[in-house]
Amino acid sequence: MIGKLKGTIDEIGEDYVLVDVHGVCYVAHCSARTLSKLGSAGEACVLFIETYVREDQLKLFGFMTALEREWFNLLQSVQGVGAKVALAVLSTLTPSELANAIALQDRAAVSRAPGVGPKVAMRLVTELKNRAPAFAGEAINIALKQELGEGVAAAPVADAVSALTNLGYSRDQAANAVAAAMKTAGDGADSAKLIRLGLKELAR
């Protein structure tokens, strides 16, 4: 099985990238979000790979992060969701947005993905509600780092998120509120200030 590809971009198509690895080109099907983050032909790229082996074909799916790949597999555990629909969902929602939609049972957010009707959206948010928390926490941590910088995992932010979850808010609600608080307070804010500002955000 192929777990990761490191090479150079040979070509980017509508739903795939052709990766040249030492003269051998691999076709990796990707979400629109992943394709948008890749460079141009000739540039280096690294993709986490999910390999599908069928009787008549071998198909590779590429992802920017291992977390996105895990969500790809988790989505397909839901009845009626195949690789195409899973990629459509990941093209529409980031892992953190998907975790948030599931936590809030937001069918409308999920149904924005092409090919996801009301029934499939309902199954996704319902069936994954109790199976997604582990993915949600990591997705939120990544989203915070991307939005606020690598230092956001430090004590004040972590303490503020923990305090808000202890008050009964979900982890994604708490993380989103603290992210907004960080933008208002700045990098030097202590946990008490982040909690106070976070509560104001949640009260809106």
From Swiss-Prot:
For region Flexible linker, the annotated ranges are 144-151
GO biological process per UniProt: DNA recombination; DNA repair
Q: Which Pfam families match?
A: HHH_5 (PF14520), RuvA_C (PF07499), RuvA_N (PF01330)
- Spans annotated as Domain I: 1-64
Which residue ranges are recorded for the region named Domain III? 152-204
The segments labelled Domain II in the record are 65-143
Q: Which SUPFAM superfamilies match?
A: DNA helicase RuvA subunit, C-terminal domain, Nucleic acid-binding proteins, RuvA domain 2-like
Q: Tell me where in or outside the cell this protein is found.
A: Cytoplasm
> What InterPro entries does the record tag this protein with?
DNA_helicase_Holl-junc_RuvA_I, NA-bd_OB-fold, RuvA, RuvA_2-like, RuvA_C, RuvA_C_sf
Instruction: Name the UniProt key words of this record, in alphabetical order.
Output: Cytoplasm, DNA damage, DNA recombination, DNA repair, DNA-binding
State any GO CC term: Holliday junction helicase complex
Q: Name one GO molecular function term.
A: four-way junction helicase activity
Q: Does the keyword DNA damage apply?
A: yes
Q: Which HAMAP family match?
A: DNA_HJ_migration_RuvA (MF_00031)
Q: How does it assemble?
A: Homotetramer. Forms an RuvA(8)-RuvB(12)-Holliday junction (HJ) complex. HJ DNA is sandwiched between 2 RuvA tetramers; dsDNA enters through RuvA and exits via RuvB. An RuvB hexamer assembles on each DNA strand where it exits the tetramer. Each RuvB hexamer is contacted by two RuvA subunits (via domain III) on 2 adjacent RuvB subunits; this complex drives branch migration. In the full resolvosome a probable DNA-RuvA(4)-RuvB(12)-RuvC(2) complex forms which resolves the HJ.
Q: What is known of its domains?
A: Has three domains with a flexible linker between the domains II and III and assumes an 'L' shape. Domain III is highly mobile and contacts RuvB.
Family the UniProt entry places it in: Belongs to the RuvA family.
Q: What function does the entry list?
A: The RuvA-RuvB-RuvC complex processes Holliday junction (HJ) DNA during genetic recombination and DNA repair, while the RuvA-RuvB complex plays an important role in the rescue of blocked DNA replication forks via replication fork reversal (RFR). RuvA specifically binds to HJ cruciform DNA, conferring on it an open structure. The RuvB hexamer acts as an ATP-dependent pump, pulling dsDNA into and through the RuvAB complex. HJ branch migration allows RuvC to scan DNA until it finds its consensus sequence, where it cleaves and resolves the cruciform DNA.
Please report the name of this protein according to its UniProt entry.
Holliday junction branch migration complex subunit RuvA
Q: Which organism is it from?
A: Rhizobium etli (strain CIAT 652)
